[in-house]
């Protein structure tokens, strides 16, 4: 354990920090493909009973009309957060037609052709058209298949009551906004160093439908006539078949300070990329993408974690960060766990909080370019070979056995877990960490290990396994588990969102061509 972290633990057991530890803020965003009863992608429009995908705060769509995204509010109570996610699932399943299901896996269901994937529609307003055009740009740049891979986004922040005592204990005398930003970047750098461990512990995509790799280079093996896999893989979603952009490969995004991070993104958003220029912004008056730059907008940059801030109307994310600093971080490295009805559970959240707190409070030197690519190499190795007991990673240019390193990190995270248990008067955090330690000792206990074991023992293809789990969760959740008050609230929220979308559409005063030009010039 680092000396800095040891000193932190002593300081943070003081009474002035007690309230802060109990008020850690988190929220969950969960993507799920909407599929037919037989496990194929739904081609129908977003159900009206779920409201407007533009304005419903709980239920929206991601890339596709068929790719639902469920969003919880921010909670300091883990059980309340999970209960809301459960309510959203139950309400959604009760309002899907023709026995449609939510696909439990991160890797998609079988597809006859990627062109069949319906791109998300957000209505006739300029902001709605912009969102749809952005997705057309993603489709034209990367293909639609990559865009319907699903995952969990975990949003994490420390409460306001934490920051002033923390700044005082560090001897910081400046603007608290700058201190918070500095420490969130501190967390992000450490997260990048150790995120391979989350991929090992929670990766749940060791296999994919064979059709997913059609006309794509890959090093996967054939498990059966319909399934490709890698024997020791953990998370193909984060590998060459998953979220990957050759155009972004050379981007060195610096998290040493906020200005460098924002400057890198802005440069990418203002630098024409030859391949996208050749494609053109439009053909015969039909738009193909927002612009021809390396990034159409900030969110196109693929990363396992992002610094975030709630934006004001009409504000760019990079502008919000520059003006007001980092408000929270968004972890984007998590697969859907097909054994869990909501893709994540409270045990995993307890561990994530301990892990992220460790990243925040431990020493975090600035990251240089050599380390940046070393970290990327470690992640790639764990994605493809994480359950190989002999796998070694690189630490400052030297090989280190992954299992040994993982055990060392968990031993340090245990200190954060013990602190949180001390404050909460519980054993939940230490228990969640103990559950992860067993996975280090036995790779078959990881989600990826369990999935391959169950597929092989059951003689199941990836498709058959995923359909089986999807049906199980659908049937369990369709049972009446919603209170009348919750049903009423969800239905009223959906209805209000449709009115809100109509109001937005009625307020537009300029044509989309002018709107897009002004947006690109901003």
Predicted regions and their residues:
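Terminal catalytic/cofactor-binding subdomain
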Residues: 1-139, 146-150, 179-189, 193-196
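Short conserved micro-motifs at the rims of enzyme active sites and ligand-binding pockets
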Residues: 43-46, 82, 115-116, 166-167, ...
């Amino acid at each position: 354990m680092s000396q800095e972290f040891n000193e932190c633990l002593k300081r943070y057991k003081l009474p002035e920090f007690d309230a802060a530890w109990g008020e850690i803020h988190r929220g969950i965003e969960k993507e799920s493909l909407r599929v037919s009863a037989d496990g194929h992608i739904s081609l129908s429009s977003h159900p009206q009973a779920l409201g407007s995908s533009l304005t419903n705060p709980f239920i929206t769509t991601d890339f596709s009309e068929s790719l639902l995204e469920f969003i919880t509010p921010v909670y300091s109570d883990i059980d309340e957060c999970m209960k809301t996610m459960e309510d959203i699932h139950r309400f959604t399943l009760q309002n899907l037609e023709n026995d449609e299901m939510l696909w439990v896996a991160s890797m998609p269901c079988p597809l006859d052709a990627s062109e069949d994937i319906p791109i998300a529609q957000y209505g006739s307003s300029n902001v709605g058209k912009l969102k749809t055009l952005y997705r057309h740009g993603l489709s034209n740049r990367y293909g639609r298949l990559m865009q319907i891979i699903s995952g969990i986004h975990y949003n994490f922040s420390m409460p306001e009551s934490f920051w002033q005592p923390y700044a005082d204990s560090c001897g910081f005398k400046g603007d608290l906004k700058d201190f918070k930003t500095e420490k969130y970047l501190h967390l992000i750098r450490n997260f990048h160093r150790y995120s391979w461990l989350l991929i090992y512990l929670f990766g749940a995509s060791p296999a994919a439908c064979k059709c997913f790799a059609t006309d794509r280079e890959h090093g996967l093996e054939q498990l059966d006539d319909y399934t490709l896999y890698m024997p020791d893989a953990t998370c193909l979603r984060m590998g060459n078949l998953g979220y990957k952009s050759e155009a972004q490969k050379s981007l060195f995004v610096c998290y040493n300070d906020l200005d460098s991070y924002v400057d890198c993104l802005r440069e990418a958003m203002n630098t024409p990329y030859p391949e996208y220029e050749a494609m053109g912004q439009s053909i015969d008056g039909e738009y193909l993408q927002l612009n021809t730059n390396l990034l159409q907008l900030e969110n196109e940059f693929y990363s396992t974690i992002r610094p975030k801030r709630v934006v004001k109307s009409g504000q760019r994310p990079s502008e919000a960060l520059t003006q007001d600093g980092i408000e929270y971080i968004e972890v984007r490295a998590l697969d859907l766990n097909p054994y869990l009805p909501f893709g994540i559970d409270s045990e995993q959240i307890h561990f994530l909080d301990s892990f992220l707190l460790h990243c925040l409070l431990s020493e975090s030197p600035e990251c240089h370019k050599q380390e940046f690519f070393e970290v990327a190499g470690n992640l790639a190795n764990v994605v493809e070979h994480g359950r190989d007991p002999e796998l070694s990673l690189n630490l400052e240019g030297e090989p280190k056995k992954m299992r040994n390193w993982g055990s060392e990190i968990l031993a340090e995270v245990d200190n954060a877990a013990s602190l949180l248990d001390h404050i909460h008067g519980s054993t939940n955090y230490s228990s969640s960490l103990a559950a992860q330690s067993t996975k280090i000792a036995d790779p078959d206990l990881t989600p990826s290990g369990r999935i391959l074991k169950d597929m092989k023992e059951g003689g199941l293809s990836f498709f058959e396994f995923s359909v089986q789990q999807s049906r199980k969760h659908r049937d369990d959740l369709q049972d009446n588990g919603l209170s009348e008050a919750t049903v009423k609230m969800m239905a009223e929220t959906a209805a209000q969102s449709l009115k809100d979308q109509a109001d937005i559409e009625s307020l537009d005063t300029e044509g989309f061509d002018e709107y897009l030009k002004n947006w690109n010039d901003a």
